[in-house]
Amino acid sequence: MDRIVIRGARQHNLKNIDVEIPKNKLVVITGPSGSGKSSLAFDTLYAEGQRRYVESLSAYARQFLGVMEKPEVDSIEGLSPAIAIDQKTTSKNPRSTVGTVTEIYDYLRVLWANVGKPHCPHCGNLLSGLSAHEILDRIVEKYKGKRVMILSPIVRGKKGEFRELLRQIEKWGYSRVKVDGELRRVIEVPPLEKNKKHTIELVIDRLTVSEEERARLLEDVEKALEFSSGLVKIEEVESGKEELFSEKLVCPEHGFSIPELSARLFSFNSPYGACPSCKGLGVKWEIDPAVLIDPEKPAVKAVKIVESGYFNYLRFPIANVIRKLGYDPRTPWKKLPESVRATVLYGSESLNFEGIIPHLERRFLEEESERIREEIEDYIVEKPCPECKGARLRKEALAVLIDGKSIWDVVNMPVGKAKEFFEELYEKLEGKEKIIADRLLKEIIERLGFLVNVGLDYLSLSRSATTLSGGEMQRIRLATQLGSKLTGVLYVLDEPSIGLHPRDTSKLINTLKGLRDLGNTVVVVEHDPETIESADHVIELGPGAGKHGGYLVAQGTVEEIKSHPSSLTGAYLSGRKEIPVPKERRKPSGKFIRIVRAKEHNLKNINVDIPLGLFVCITGVSGSGKSTLIYDILYKYAKNYFYGTHEQVGEVEKIEGLENIDKVINIDQSPIGRTPRSNPATYTKVFDLIRNLFAQTPEAKARGYKPGRFSFNVKGGRCEACQGEGVIKVEMHFLPPVYVTCEVCKGKRYNRETLEITYKGKNIADVLEMTVDEAYDFFENHPAIRRKLQILKDVGLGYIKLGQPAPTLSGGEAQRIKLARELSKKETGRTLYLLDEPTTGLHMDDVKKLIDVLQRLVDKGNTVVVIEHNLDVIKCADWIIDLGPEGGERGGQVVAVGTPEEVAQNPNSYTGKYLRKYLKKETLKV
């Protein structure tokens, strides 16, 4: 069968549609926001492909995978196993890095373990092994007169029960072993858990070291080396101190030795490789004196946290210790000697004073109250681990070099540079090393190449996955899938072009075509014109959003879509419709926010002027430093300035001009709430007005109902059986939890008495079920309610229900709800708004609405700063600040500044090059 045939798809708002998707082709699903694209691609196609695969597994395996519900569809024929690569699942694990997610780091560990040359970290000498006689000499020299145990580490951190091994030890005639650090008789060792890692050390002998015992000691050492493949451990009986000797690798000058070189020595997720100080995280969290202290104030009032109600009990001990040291507590902190300040901060045993920082750190670990922990958290900063300097690995691992580089040196390079290193290494290696490394290097170079091809050459393999954007994470997964070389699979992707500069879109398209050419069907939900034009087949849903969408509007080749009379996408692609360039642009007023000497991450000590009262676009290729400049520096600095927070600001000398604005607001894509209790009506405050209206009805007044009666969050009006949730969660084993509609209120969230109150024949639950468009017509006589609903319509959200639970909203929808909330406020007109890629998830027609909304914010006298790659938005800006020229190390400079016309003329700007064809020819006069 050469196609996937979907019959009667009704998931969410799909209107019983039939769709045919050609196999082994690049297929784009497009249409307005809310038209049902994700419902078709993810909730129907992927969900059914995954469900059928999972159902074929045993019940034991299914309990770990969960079972997906069968989508609302009559039939799907010709379906392949499905893999979804979406934006939502970014990693929250601080141990995940680009290297571990792509699995490239696993290959590197094996390479360093097999080809790496261990060196001494103290003198740089190549390590060599010790013979049994040399080990004997060291033991006699170091432990003379001391009672020691000679141990042979037979098992080191391996999973298993080891019953057979323990029987074997008995046969050899030994009676004692150390299991996981505990000394036991062999016959008394309890059964070991097979899924836990264990360490078993055989006790060869116990004796007091002396010259007379040399022969016995030599025999012990040789036996220990034989049993453990070259290792012997000496444990001092009295102190418990241990020392490991190796037949293999040791520095003759410093005695520094490495056990055996194995892949786990290079794993920061294993106790054998992780830095013992930070446990492989590369960072430590500690209270920063610079954040905690105000040096201008008198010493007794200088500790900021002491001025809050919770910690004012510390004031007396601080004053007391300063007096004991011979100083007046009213002396300004900065005038106290360094030794006195250190005692106040870190304590003194002789004065019986714990110190402010150790005290707060202890309270943070022991405290039950979330409120107090949050208070202390404001003063905690993340710093590189002082021992490994952020490398995550123990010094033994970092001392193993290939071509003069440690594994950390290489994972810290940008991916593009690392690829060059391995290509050169491949040419250099010879003989046995070449044979060992051949396959490993080919695999590493190929996988790094995939990352370069999806426009991620600026990332390093050591970059923490928690700091990646949704778009970056999705493209990393895409590169990983290419590396897996699967065929016959259905890949479903969600807007992979997000976060990509137009320069890199062609690389992404080639990657998608590469997946297709392996023999896979690639289905992409996408709005980017270039990606749509590269598709083999286009499916357009619409014509509108929500209940006005879910129909199949058009499908076929790109040319067929362009000429289709009903296709909105075709109208934009063919030029019949377009987003107009503004007739005139606002001019800078002379007031600026000036960022001076920014050098966080890859920013090259730059100065940036952001003109106030304008619509400003920050542009540049991925990794050029846009988010660092706007979020790590400007937003955090402004937040501390306006709201007195203690955010860790990126490296910058100063920011001037903040006195020209009143506040800063970040409108990001994070959810408007974590629980189903949050919804668009509660978030935009329109629900307050609706509840007031219901409380004003004659029946509600007669019963004495206040607006609180119509809230599903408090006792009184809500259904108590489900506590206003409308559903009850039932825990299932082998299956995911099931949400059952509440029997009592039938999902309406309120009790019967509350639902008896109606307005124009509808009760409060009916209103929450209305879409924004329906509610707008329903409340025609209430201008205050309509004003808030009108703004939701303006940002393109007329299709969402007022009571739609927050977790079901996409990032783009959440961001536009926040925009609507800001627009509905009575504006002062001196606000700085920051937005990161607000066009995410928007069709070209919705982008037009978004631009109108942003222009309205600026017309009110505000400043809107947008990080954006969408050329339709960029061409409508008043001012552009273009960073680059490249990503990563080769980025971080200001490439071009000015109006879109000025930037388009700049020969050094990639943005300018692509912008030219979007601007009217007549506006590009030189």
Swiss-Prot record:
A family per Pfam: UvrA_DNA-bind
Statement: the UniProt record of this protein carries the keyword Zinc: yes
GO CC, any one term: cytoplasm
Entries under InterPro entries matching the protein: AAA+_ATPase (IPR003593), ABC_transporter-like_ATP-bd (IPR003439), ABC_transporter-like_CS (IPR017871), ATP_grasp_subdomain_1 (IPR013815), P-loop_NTPase (IPR027417), UvrA (IPR004602), UvrA_DNA-bd (IPR041552), UvrA_inter (IPR041102)
Domain ABC transporter intervals: 308-568, 588-916
Ranges annotated as C4-type zinc finger: 251-278, 719-745
Domain of life, source organism: Bacteria
Compartment(s): Cytoplasm
Entry similarity comment: Belongs to the ABC transporter superfamily. UvrA family.
Subunit structure: Forms a heterotetramer with UvrB during the search for lesions.
Name of this protein: UvrABC system protein A
Natural source organism: Aquifex aeolicus (strain VF5)
